[in-house]
UniProtKB/Swiss-Prot annotation:
Catalytic activity: 2 reduced [2Fe-2S]-[ferredoxin] + NADP(+) + H(+) = 2 oxidized [2Fe-2S]-[ferredoxin] + NADPH
InterPro entries: FAD/NAD-bd_sf, FAD/NAD-binding_dom, Fd--NADP_Rdtase_type_2, Ferredoxin-NADP_redctase_2
Cofactor binding comment, as recorded: Binds 1 FAD per subunit.
GO molecular function terms noted in the UniProt entry: ferredoxin-NADP+ reductase activity; flavin adenine dinucleotide binding; NADP binding
Family label: Belongs to the ferredoxin--NADP reductase type 2 family.
Name of the molecule in the record: Ferredoxin--NADP reductase
EC number: 1.18.1.2
Cofactor requirement: FAD
Complex and partners: Homodimer.
Species: Halalkalibacterium halodurans (strain ATCC BAA-125 / DSM 18197 / FERM 7344 / JCM 9153 / C-125)
Classification via Pfam families: Pyr_redox_2 (PF07992)
First-level EC class: oxidoreductase
Residues binding FAD: T18, E37, Q45, Y50, V90, F124, D286, T327
Source species, domain of life: Bacteria
Length: 330
């Protein structure tokens, strides 16, 4: 295949909600679109971190399960058959003399007339449990993500953490698991006030201020967890079937920092057209920043069409930035 045949109109780096909607909108603008995603699946953090959790602040949905939203976004984008490249991490972007871009991943090289970066918070990794022997149980019955609530049915579950995810998982697992214990190293939870209120009214066993001090198991599964009172002498040993740790996540822009883009506080600076400082490269969603920026899925859904429409005009100066409403296009 020649480079000309491989040349896409718009390449979207990041296959989360904003990237998926950008792919749909790019297709609607009759652009040849490709998505490059570093994860094994599309959906970004919604699919990777909390597919079973409900989202309440997407317009038109009183509530929607994260994975269901991802599935709908995929179906919407698939109407225009975008090319999908999964498990590829973009390492470098080069602007060529003909104003097109060469995009090198850890697996292959891609070519595009314009780029939209929708990489969310960048690459993210969970903050891990720093207790002796923890690593050997990761992916067995020590988890940092909950992908399937039913996997915890009838089990004794210990959750460690004090933020939104830890509290939300405790509440969601309460009716599924045999029992749920939530420990936090501080007396006060950092989660949303309403969630904490629901937690206090639930049957979840709350132990504060405690932290995990020891794991006991057979190398395949943890059977007992010892917890130590923080700044105290109390010690308890709990029987467990599953352990979920949520201490938050560490995100990084990684190679993006080396692409020559203007970066501010780990975000890509854009103007009202979603243009970066490099003509032909746009950014949308949580990865970008501008005065008054609010990082919400709903915001990304508005920024994606802005980025696509301006990318279309960049590729084809005769194209209208605003194409009209979808009701007149289908």
């Amino acid at each position: 295949m020649s480079r000309k045949e491989e040349l896409y109109d718009i390449t979207i780096i990041g296959g989360g909600p904003t990237g998926l909607f950008a792919a749909f909108y790019g297709g609607m603008r009759q652009a040849k679109v490709k998505i490059i995603e570093s994860m094994p699946q599309l959906g970004g953090q919604l699919a990777a971190l909390y597919p079973e959790k409900y989202i309440y602040d997407v317009a038109g949905f009183p509530k929607v399960k994260a994975q269901d939203l991802v599935n709908d976004l995929k179906r919407q984008a698939e109407q225009f058959n975008p090319t999908i490249a999964l498990e590829q991490s973009v390492q470098n972007v080069t602007k060529e003399t003909d104003d097109t871009f060469t995009i090198k991943t850890d697996k292959e090289t891609h070519y595009s007339k314009a780029i939209i970066i929708t990489a969310g918070a960048g690459a993210f990794q969970p903050r891990r449990l720093e207790v002796e022997g923890a690593k050997q149980y990761e992916g067995k019955n020590l988890q940092y993500f909950v992908n399937d609530l039913n996997a915890y049915a009838g089990k004794n579950v210990l959750i460690s953490g004090g933020g939104d995810s830890a509290v939300d998982w405790a509440l969601m697992l309460e009716p599924v698991a045999k029992n749920v214990t939530l420990i936090h190293r501080r007396d006060k939870f950092r989660a949303h006030e309403h969630s904490v209120e629901l937690l206090q009214k639930s049957s979840v066993n709350i132990l504060t201020p405690f932290a995990i001090s020891e794991l006991s198991g057979d190398g395949e599964k943890i059977h007992h967890v010892t917890i130590q009172e923080v700044k105290g002498d109390a010690v308890e040993t709990l029987d467990v079937d599953e352990v979920i740790v949520n201490f938050g996540f560490v995100s990084s822009l990684g190679p993006i920092k080396g692409w020559g883009l203007e970066i501010e506080k780990n975000s890509i600076v854009v103007n009202t057209k979603m243009e970066t400082n490099i003509p032909g490269i746009y950014a949308a969603g949580d990865i970008c920043t501008y005065p008054g920026k609010v990082k919400l899925i709903a915001t990304g859904f508005g920024e994606a069409p802005t980025a696509v429409n301006n990318a279309k005009a960049f590729i084809d100066p005769t194209a209208r930035v605003f194409p009209g409403h979808s009701t007149s296009l289908f």
